[in-house]
Amino acid sequence: MDNNAAKPLVTVLGASGLVGTAITRELASRPIRLRLVGRRPTVVPPDARAEIEVRTLDLAVPGAVAEAIAGADAIVHLVAHISGESTWRVSSDDPIAERVNLGLVHDLVEAVRAERPARPPVVLLAGSMSQAGRSSTARIDGSEPDRPLTTYDRQKLDAELAIQAATDEGLIRGATLRLATLYTQGTDSPALDRGVVCAMMRKALADQPLTMWHDGTVKRDLVCVDDVARAFLAALDQPDATTGRSWLVGTGQATSIADLFTIISKVVAAHTGRAPVPVTSVRPAEHSMPTDLLDFVLDPTAFQDATNWAPQVSLLEGLDQLAAAMVAQTASSPA
């Protein structure tokens, strides 16, 4: 018997990004076959137990998705179109964004349809809590009707619906993890993080004031990417419990932007020995999005109950670890 073939094959699409790198680190410790697919070179963890194959592909090229997922028992789809500094700022007339954020999911479904594996593969899609749009409650719990307010969120919702339709058809065993606001604690390179936390941390390290739009009362649910990686593994391990719907993944804790920026200022000061940089309020920029001034805090209870997953990294701990990592990185960089 071919022992290699007996090991499950997990394919990670978007493995070179922030979430993909964290998931790869977790999966690499398992006795599986692991196919890492990204446009950039993917970091392979040292001392990996998994048999790792790295493929550098532009998945938007016709046929690339089919090549990437061929023979996979499970697929983690993390690819998103990045326009400038943030994935969620997408123009409604950007054909590349629609091709990547939605078209690749259609390619995935059609590739599975053509291959017709004996057992439908598990497919996990990375979504966003902001897909729900404006909520009338303090915390999003998944029962709200989806009314996405941005092009990015509409595309992510359409991708989620395509995964759901393919699951209903019996082609795949799919689920979407709608993620809270992500940040890294520096376990992997902070350069991978394009989010607001790392951006403000860099400004504080440069001794620049931290500017927030409006009065800073907007609240966010902030979750460490290492906890998110563990959430994806929990869903992979329990497909019977998670298949067929979307799940909210976060901490359930509300943090105002003013409090977040103040904490960042203080933890950076603690590591540099300088005075904390000021936190100031400015008018929202012209390129601000409808979601920028809305609260987004979620209730992750359903996912926790289904998988026994729970976040392990507190915000203060994560920010302190990130500050330490970025200070160390700055100190080791050539002058």
Mark where each language-model region is:
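Flexible, glycine-rich beta-alpha linker
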Residues: 132-133, 150-151, 175-194
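NAD(P)H-binding glycine-rich loop region in Rossmannoid oxidoreductase-like domains
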Residues: 52, 57-100
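Amphipathic terminal alpha-helices
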Residues: 2, 9, 314-335
